[in-house]
Amino acid sequence: MKNYLFEVCTNSVESCIAAQEGGANRVELCAGIPEGGTTPSYGEIAMAREVLTTTRLHVIIRPRGGDFLYSPVEVKTMLKDIEMVRQLGADGVVFGCLTTNGGIDVPVMKQLMEASKGLSVTFHRAFDVCRDASEALEQIIDLGCDRILTSGQQATAELGIPLLKELRERANGRITLLAGCGVNEKNICRIAKETGIQEFHFSARESIKSGMEYKNEAVSMGGTVHISEYERNVTTVKRVKDTIESITSSL
């Protein structure tokens, strides 16, 4: 019987609680989900650690949205955030850095890896926009990362099945492949069967309406990018359970 592991991408303490109740083995805590995930606040991390009593806590270290080419000041920020995360008792960190030509920024990654000693390290989906997946795989293995979160360099993990399978075969147990992006209760079995990957990353989120009675929908807090202030996406226990059970029930 295969030992599957399920990581839920959470955007709040509320979502962390739902992930744990739904049976997740691990959460990746992020702020700024519309930007692909940014470093959450001190308070959010501290509270997540408090409520996650049976589920491992990994925290994204990403100072901003956009590309993965970081300035010296941003790297210093990431180093300080790693130390903060360590002090708050997280089990792991999630980061990734690229060079101008789409390669792995090995010197910067070495700094971050040194700061992360004793923590589990996931190289995140910066991998999916790197120039050469095979070369990047070897570099990330050499750096000592524990896993790579990837959609197989496609818009979703389901579309990336061919590369995910190839990467798992190339890795040959030297690093864990964590399939993520668009993974849900409808496709997780197919992804597992066709790639042989055993770790999965998904959000299991649903949109919920705001409790606000008074609403001024003429104003957006996001400038020209309009995201409604009167609804938000949260992880739900049901969707976490449904996703996990859709694959475990087939064993």
UniProtKB/Swiss-Prot annotation:
Specify whether RNA-binding is a keyword of the entry: no
Compartment(s): Cytoplasm
Protein name, per record? PF03932 family protein CutC
Q: Which family does it belong to?
A: Belongs to the CutC family.
On the tree of life, the source organism's domain of life is Bacteria
Main localization, broad class = cytoplasm
Q: Name one GO cellular component term.
A: cytoplasm
Species this chain originates from: Bacteroides fragilis (strain YCH46)
Which SUPFAM superfamilies does the UniProt entry name for this protein? Answer: CutC-like
> InterPro entries in the record, alphabetically?
CutC-like, CutC-like_dom_sf
Molecular function as annotated in GO: copper ion binding
Q: Which UniProt keywords apply?
A: Cytoplasm
